[in-house]
């Protein structure tokens, strides 16, 4: 499931294990360097390129997962 993959990436990059689907990336301490690492992980681990503007527009696991699903992306 895409949201599981997204959550795994966020937990690793934000160094937290308690991220829920509606937690806001920025409220969790996210910033541009971490966002760039997450963007790379999406490509490498989920096989989908997510533009930076979409990452800003979809700052929760649930919303970015829905965006990725709307692309028809499949996890590897």
Describe the function of each predicted region:
Residues 1-76:
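Phosphopantetheine-dependent thiolation modules in NRPS/PKS and related acyl-activating systems
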């Amino acid at each position: 499931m895409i949201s599981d993959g997204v959550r795994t990436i966020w937990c690793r990059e934000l160094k937290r294990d308690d991220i829920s689907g509606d937690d806001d990336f920025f409220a969790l301490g996210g910033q541009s360097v971490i966002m760039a690492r997450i963007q790379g992980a999406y490509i490498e681990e989920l096989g989908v390129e997510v533009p930076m503007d979409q990452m800003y527009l979809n700052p929760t696991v649930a919303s970015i997962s829905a965006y990725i699903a709307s692309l028809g992306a499949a996890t590897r």
